[in-house]
Design a protein with these regions (language model features):
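C-terminal motif of bacterial Sec signal peptides marking the signal peptidase cleavage site
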Residues: 24-25
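Bacterial Sec-dependent N-terminal signal peptides
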Residues: 1-10
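Short connector loops at secondary-structure junctions
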Residues: 163-181
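Glycine-rich, highly charged phosphate/nucleotide-binding loops
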Residues: 182-195
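N-terminal, intrinsically disordered, polar/charged segments of Gram-positive cell-envelope systems
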Residues: 31-56, 108-122
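Conserved small/polar residues in nucleotide/adenosyl-binding loops
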Residues: 231-233
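Bacterial N-terminal signal peptides
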Residues: 14-21
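Beta-rich interaction/scaffold domains
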Residues: 48-110
Length: 233
């Protein structure tokens, strides 16, 4: 009788040990599954956060580009151009592809239009008494600007060596683009006229390169009218 009781007790203890082992295994599996699920969720959240960060960085650049894609120059223009370029340079290649605004796109800074160093903005002082101001609409394509606009200016300088040839663009949008992207500063009409006055120019000949009589041609003449009392034009 005592031997049978011992056998029953041993069997019960063995069963309990097996159940404990099964429960421990189940608990470990559940814990492993929960940890795996948490890791997956964290990875997904990190991926979403990374995508959002990329989009925000690209949108910031797009907003900065749109802010300088304007026809009016202000006291903040130089700083805005510098800020837009710095923000663009800080983007990754993938982020640059996401830049999209009202006017902004990856080509604003990313497109290769030629070597800007081959151009001459002709915005130097020491003009002298006689100035020949070449006024163009302008272009942000570096190779074209160096070949066409600079070509005209160089030809005029060669033909009139006693006159100082200077440049002005009527499209502030283009001036801002070239300045922001290439660091080349080109005078607008007001800057060019103020430069002439500051340099004591007495005789100013204005040579437009516009192909037609449009709004910016009229704006050029309106600007010249403001300086008639200061310079012989």
């Amino acid at each position: 009788m005592r031997k049978r009781t011992l056998h029953k007790t041993a069997a019960a203890l063995t069963a309990l040990a097996l159940c404990a082992g099964v429960l421990t295994g189940c608990g470990g599996a559940a814990s492993s599954t929960a940890a795996s699920s948490t890791a997956s969720s964290a990875a997904a959240s990190s991926e979403v956060s990374s995508e959002e960060a990329d989009e925000l960085a690209a949108k910031n650049v797009a907003d900065l580009i749109d802010a300088i894609y304007v026809q009016e120059r202000t006291d903040d223009t130089d700083a805005q151009c510098a800020a837009a370029k710095a923000a663009w340079d800080a983007l990754t290649d993938a982020q640059k592809e996401l830049v999209e605004g009202e006017e902004a796109d990856p080509d604003y800074f990313g497109r290769d239009t030629g070597d800007a160093s081959k151009d001459d903005p002709r915005n130097a002082d020491d003009i002298g008494e006689n100035e020949l101001l070449v006024v163009s609409f302008g272009t942000s394509f570096n190779a074209s600007r160096a070949a066409d606009i600079k070509g005209i200016e160089d030809a005029l300088q060669a033909a009139y060596p006693d006159w100082s040839v200077r440049r002005a663009f009527t499209a502030q949008i283009i001036i801002n683009h070239v300045q922001a992207r290439d660091g080349e500063k080109i005078d607008n009409m007001q800057q060019a006229m103020d430069r002439a006055v500051a340099n004591g120019v007495k005789n100013l000949v204005v040579q437009p390169t516009h192909l037609m009589h449009g709004a910016e041609y009229d704006e050029m003449n309106e600007m010249l009218d403001q300086y008639l009392s200061l310079i012989h034009i």
